[in-house]
């Protein structure tokens, strides 16, 4: 039922947010075998037995941290950003139990749950300007209570304890003590904080012990993560040098006058020969993960008891344990468990976007292959830069920045094959229309034409020293176009050569003075192949393929420049009835990729869109555009002006009965725009009138002399500026025009003569009469010279001439 009501529904997520520390939690409890991992804005619950995914959706920003309750019934996720959320999810249903909006001003960067499951600690994301952070403590009992079951009159859920972190080092890790939930440890790159709290207190007590390299006669690397040693008073901090800093309450504390509970660094101990990437605890063991992919277990005395060094999965980012011991250990005799390594089975996530399931008993295996674990999911490239859907099969290809290429089955969700291009930087790829070719472009300028089935090379060409950024194949499969970083379009053609055919380089053309955003082939109504490109310079160029040849090079047929001020174009596509799209497969799936290392497959259901369109059509175009406008007061005002314009057109003093046709002449459109607060320039007016004529063509009319209210709303919504002009824009304009401030002042100034001259000579110049009339209306002065002082500051011009409230602008800037 839900799918019928949603145009897009997430069907599968390939890959995971491999860079997030502790980004995987193990939900296996003896009855189910599930994990939950982060994939950009979504948390994915994956059932390893049934091979099914359940999606926890609701975050608008990438999720930064995840924890689970001890009984694995709930998971908690949090993110950072302007609409940050902290959400408690029911694992069985996939629905949120409790949602906290803005748990911190900028969201949550890291969090941890106490061993008894009663408390949740969060560390806020750093303020972008001040770097300020805070540590908070939440009651899990309150977070697990649905809003409808909360006591009546209870306000928004807030933390019980909150304390600002002293400035100087952004904290990125926090952990509870397994021995005492009233103690926590956090660390940044160079400082460690020990936190403690007492029931009823609104603030943490904290202490940050000093650490100097000369104390250990060696340098100490940046801190990665910190934990308490189970059953002891010690704490550990892992470093990028592969060392553990050991903190304890013993030593010289009494001699320096500090409290006996204030820990100090007493030892530096190397446990990896590479940077440590992860530190955690399970039972009485300390668990470490390294850049080398090794996972090691230590007892409370820091003696190594087990090591898993054959995983070969990449740098470790997460180690997550099942809630129970495996059956073979849970029911073993005491004699059998003596001196045996006993921990629950676990999963290891790595920076290579791999998730590996490991049986703890495999440590005792002699065969290295049995110690590698089993892959939970085929791993997607962690640095996807482009993807392409196969036009005829349920497959897609992804290209990684490091030169990796993979082919995936979008139904079985498995890896079909791939290839690694050594010493190449991936840039772009696309399929030919029949799916037989896969064309790949690289940052070196190389263009590889591959067999789409086995990814073997058919042709390799390099005709530019600049990196390729876009590539396209014609519908006939006879032309390939590529764009490079030097704003050039390169054209290749499949031409006869000695009784056979081969790909030939036709030439290149620099028709843009900005980055090329999109290259696309299409077909004219007569069936001729067309090639167009659009650039960030606002230019659309069409190339003459018929006139282009190896001898003549690439020929330009025509070009069109978008008016300035409308934003830079980012893509170009031919409208239907073209049957194939780069990101579509048989019109049933939409593939979406980003810089987060994931590819999402969405099911497309057009029924809700058709119902919405039918309902809007039945309600009239005005209702549709009114919904888009979303401002009832402005809509009412525009409707009043529209009615007044009809009356004014017939004559305000007319005595005969009014005939209100529901339309106004096109000539009144600019004035109606101004009445709504949009003051179009002459160029904007030209664009409005062009849009009106486009409306006429879409209605099979030669021209349109009148517009309806729905037409007016359409024009307003499509042409109004995204943001209003602000005082900051005026200041920037003064600087652009050469304004200089007084010594020690950053406020730009222009002379009155210079400003008046610029208004009458640059941009869309005003005549002397127009300028005098405008300044008189704005300031009441009879002459331009009396409307402003000899030297005009940007702030004076904004406040005294344009009427901006600069005090509010200054207050907003200050906040």
From Swiss-Prot:
It is found in: Cytoplasm, Cytoskeleton, Flagellum axoneme. Signal peptide: none annotated. GO terms for cellular component: axoneme; motile cilium. WD repeats lie at residues 58-99, 103-148, 166-205, 218-257, 271-308, 379-418, 420-460, 463-502, 511-553, 573-612. Its main location: cytoplasm. GO terms for biological process: cilium movement. Keywords: Cell projection, Cilium, Cytoplasm, Cytoskeleton, Flagellum, Repeat, WD repeat. As component of a spoke-associated complex, regulates flagellar dynein activity by mediating regulatory signals between the radial spokes and dynein arms. Identified in a spoke-associated complex containing CFAP61, CFAP91 and CFAP251; the complex is associated with the radial spokes in the axoneme. The complex associates with Calmodulin; the association is calcium sensitive. PANTHER family: CILIA- AND FLAGELLA-ASSOCIATED PROTEIN 251, WD-40 REPEAT PROTEIN. This is Cilia- and flagella-associated protein 251. The lineage of its organism: Eukaryota, Viridiplantae, Chlorophyta, core chlorophytes, Chlorophyceae. The gene is CFAP251.
């Amino acid at each position: 039922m839900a799918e019928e009501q949603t145009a897009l529904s997430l069907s599968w997520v390939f890959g995971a947010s491999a860079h997030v520390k502790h980004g995987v939690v193990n939900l296996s409890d003896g009855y189910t075998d599930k994990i939950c991992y982060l994939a950009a804005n979504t948390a994915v619950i994956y059932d390893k037995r049934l091979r099914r995914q359940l999606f926890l959706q609701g975050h608008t920003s990438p999720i930064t941290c995840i924890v689970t309750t001890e009984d694995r019934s709930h998971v908690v996720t949090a993110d950072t950003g302007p609409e940050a959320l902290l959400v408690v999810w029911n694992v069985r249903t996939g629905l949120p139990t409790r949602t906290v909006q803005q748990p911190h001003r900028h969201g949550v960067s890291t969090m941890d749950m106490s061993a008894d499951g009663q408390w949740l600690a969060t560390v806020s994301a750093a303020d972008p300007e001040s770097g300020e952070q805070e540590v908070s403590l939440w009651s899990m009992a309150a977070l697990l209570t649905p809003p409808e079951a909360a006591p009546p009159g209870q306000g928004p859920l807030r933390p019980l304890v909150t304390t600002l972190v002293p400035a100087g080092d952004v904290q990125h890790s926090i952990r509870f003590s397994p021995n005492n939930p009233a103690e926590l440890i956090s660390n940044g790159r160079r400082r460690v904080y020990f936190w403690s709290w007492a029931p009823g207190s609104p603030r943490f007590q904290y202490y940050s012990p000093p650490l100097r390299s000369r104390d250990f006669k060696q340098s100490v690397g940046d801190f990665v993560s910190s934990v308490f040693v189970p059953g002891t008073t010690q704490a550990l901090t892992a470093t990028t040098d592969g060392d553990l800093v050991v903190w304890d309450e013993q030593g010289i504390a009494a001699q320096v006058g500090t409290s006996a509970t204030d820990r100090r660094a007493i030892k530096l101990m190397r446990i990896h020969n590479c940077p440590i990437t992860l530190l955690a605890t399970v039972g009485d063991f300390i668990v470490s993960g390294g850049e080398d992919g090794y996972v090691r277990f230590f007892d409370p005395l820091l003696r190594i008891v087990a090591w898993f060094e054959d995983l070969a999965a990449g740098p470790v980012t997460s180690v997550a344990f099942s809630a129970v011991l495996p059956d073979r250990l849970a029911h073993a005799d005491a004699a059998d468990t003596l001196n045996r390594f006993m921990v629950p089975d676990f999963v290891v996530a790595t920076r290579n976007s791999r998730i590996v399931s490991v049986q703890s008993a495999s440590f005792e295996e002699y065969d290295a292959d049995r110690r590698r674990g089993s892959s939970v999911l085929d791993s997607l490239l962690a640095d996807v830069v482009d993807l392409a859907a196969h036009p005829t099969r349920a497959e897609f290809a992804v290209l990684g920045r490091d030169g990796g290429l993979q082919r995936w089955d979008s139904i079985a969700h498995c890896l079909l094959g791939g290839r690694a291009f050594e010493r190449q930087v991936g840039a772009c790829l696309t399929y030919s229309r029949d799916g037989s070719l896969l064309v790949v472009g690289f940052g070196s300028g190389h263009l590889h034409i591959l067999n789409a089935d086995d990814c073997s090379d058919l042709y390799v060409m390099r005709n530019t020293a600049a990196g390729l950024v876009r590539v396209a194949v014609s519908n006939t499969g006879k032309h390939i176009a590529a764009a490079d970083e030097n704003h050039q379009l390169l054209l290749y053609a499949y031409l006869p050569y000695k009784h056979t055919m081969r790909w030939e380089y036709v030439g290149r053309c620099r028709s843009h003075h900005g980055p090329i955003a999109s290259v696309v082939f299409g077909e004219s109504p007569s069936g001729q192949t067309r090639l167009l490109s659009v650039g960030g310079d606002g230019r659309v160029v069409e190339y003459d393929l018929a006139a282009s040849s190896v001898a003549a090079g690439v020929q330009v047929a025509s070009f069109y420049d978008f008016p300035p001020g409308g934003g830079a174009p980012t893509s170009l596509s031919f409208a239907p009835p073209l049957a194939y799209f780069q990101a579509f497969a048989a019109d049933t799936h939409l593939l979406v990729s980003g810089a987060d290392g994931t590819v999402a497959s969405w099911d497309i259901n057009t029924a809700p869109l058709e119902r919405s369109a039918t309902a809007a059509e039945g309600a009239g175009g005005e209702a549709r555009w009114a919904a888009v406008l979303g401002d009832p007061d402005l809509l009412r005002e525009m409707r009043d002006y529209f009615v007044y314009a009809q009356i004014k057109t017939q004559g305000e003093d007319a005595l005969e009965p009014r005939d209100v046709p529901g339309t106004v002449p096109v000539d009144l459109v600019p004035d109606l725009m101004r009445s709504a607060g949009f003051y179009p320039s002459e160029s904007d007016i030209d664009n409005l009138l062009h849009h009106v004529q486009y409306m006429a063509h879409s209605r099979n009319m030669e021209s349109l002399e009148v517009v309806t209210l729905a037409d007016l709303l359409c024009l307003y919504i499509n042409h109004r500026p995204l943001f209003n002009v602000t005082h900051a824009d005026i200041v920037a304009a003064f600087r652009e025009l050469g304004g200089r401030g007084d010594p020690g002042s950053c406020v730009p100034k222009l002379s009155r003569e210079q400003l008046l001259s610029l208004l009458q000579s640059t941009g869309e110049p005003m005549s002397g009469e127009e300028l005098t009339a405008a300044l008189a209306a704005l300031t009441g002065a009879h002459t331009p010279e009396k409307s402003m002082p000899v030297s005009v500051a940007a702030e004076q011009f904004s406040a005294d001439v344009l009427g901006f409230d600069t005090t509010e602008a200054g207050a907003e800037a200050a906040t």
